[in-house]
Amino acid sequence: MSGNNFNASNADTDHLPQVSILAQYIKDLSFENPNAPAVYQWQTQPHIEVQFNIGTQPMAQDVYEVALKVDVSAKADEGVVFHVELVYNGLFAIKNVPADQIQPFLYIEAPRILFPFVRRILADSVRDGNFPPLMLEPIDFAALYMQQTEQQDMLSNTEPAGQA
């Protein structure tokens, strides 16, 4: 047998960055079909608006909750076709990660992990309302995060006008 041993002891890995998903779950789900059954006779194509938010909060030492909040509204000339609200959460344990890397993880990687589940739940909910499944396009969470941080940097660098 070869003398190479690839088994790392706990002492060797205790200082390495570790991230794990402790749980993921629907925190809130609402599907409204206020104009059924008349809506199924409407001929106009609905306009669909999607709003997306990410929220985070610490739950315990090294444990964070990440919430993906999605609000989908479909409207036609005749009225509201359907409305879906979903809050899907993940509980993440983050250990030995540098402090400056925690926020990017919570706003980029954690949502990227949760998004496929959000997409499926929304598609199933809309389909179960007797509409074609709503298939959300993939979201570039890294680009969104960079855009948000740039906007925050610009706002913090803008000095208020003083009085003369």
UniProtKB/Swiss-Prot annotation:
What the entry lists under Pfam families is as follows: SecB
Which keywords describe this protein according to UniProt?
Answer: Chaperone, Cytoplasm, Protein transport, Translocation, Transport
Q: Where in the cell is it found?
A: Cytoplasm
**Disulfide bridge map:** none
Query: What are its GO biological-process terms?
Result: protein folding; protein tetramerization; protein transport
- Cellular component GO terms, alphabetical: cytoplasm
* Any one Gene Ontology molecular-function term assigned to this protein's record: unfolded protein binding
Q: How does it assemble?
A: Homotetramer, a dimer of dimers. One homotetramer interacts with 1 SecA dimer.
Belongs to which family? Belongs to the SecB family.
Alphabetized PANTHER family for the sequence: PROTEIN-EXPORT PROTEIN SECB, PTHR36918
Annotated function: One of the proteins required for the normal export of preproteins out of the cell cytoplasm. It is a molecular chaperone that binds to a subset of precursor proteins, maintaining them in a translocation-competent state. It also specifically binds to its receptor SecA.
- Protein known as: Protein-export protein SecB
State which gene encodes it. Answer: secB
